[in-house]
Amino acid sequence: DRSVSRGLGDVYKRQVLGIIKRPDNTFLITQRVLTKAWAPGHWEVSGGACQAGETSFQAVCREVLEETGVDVSHADGGFEFSYRRDNPEEKDNYFVDIYKFNMDITEADIHLQTEETAGFRFATAEEIKAIADRGEFLHYDSIRKVFE
């Protein structure tokens, strides 16, 4: 089950985000398709919800592979930290497990899931911060320490 109950009927979902860092200190970021209902065209790192029976690590490996074509299951790196988001009004409460993988990948290794992702780039931490400063990078305040 991908939901975690916590007191007074609050339900929290488990989400995952997977960051890929290259030896040149750039990170793989992807751009959401313009047809997304929420935050179309915004930049992000790969991720999504855990499915029933899936561990957090299995979920991040699946999500990164689905969205980018990159298999992180045997990459150096791994779990970094978790954060919690509380939004009881919208019943959108979740925990997010953050993973960072160190991989020497190139543009040729990327095969985007076109239903979800419009584009990608390899960006430095400074470039990602600049995108976030424009309000165009999702979850930046919650995950920024992973880019250090």
Question: Language-model segments: which ranges?
Answer:
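Single conserved hydrophobic/aromatic residue that forms the stacking wall/gate
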Residues: 1-8, 12
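A structural signal for short, well-ordered beta-strand segments
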Residues: 4, 18, 46, 99-101
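A glycine-rich, hydrophobic loop/mini-helix early in the fold
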Residues: 17-47
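Beta-hairpin (beta-strand-turn-beta-strand) motif
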Residues: 23, 32-35, 48-50, 55, ...
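Short, cationic motifs built from Arg/Lys/His that form the positively charged side of catalytic pockets
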Residues: 32, 62-66, 121
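Nudix hydrolase/Nudix homology domain
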Residues: 36, 40-41, 81-86, 90-148
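The catalytic Nudix box helix
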Residues: 45-78
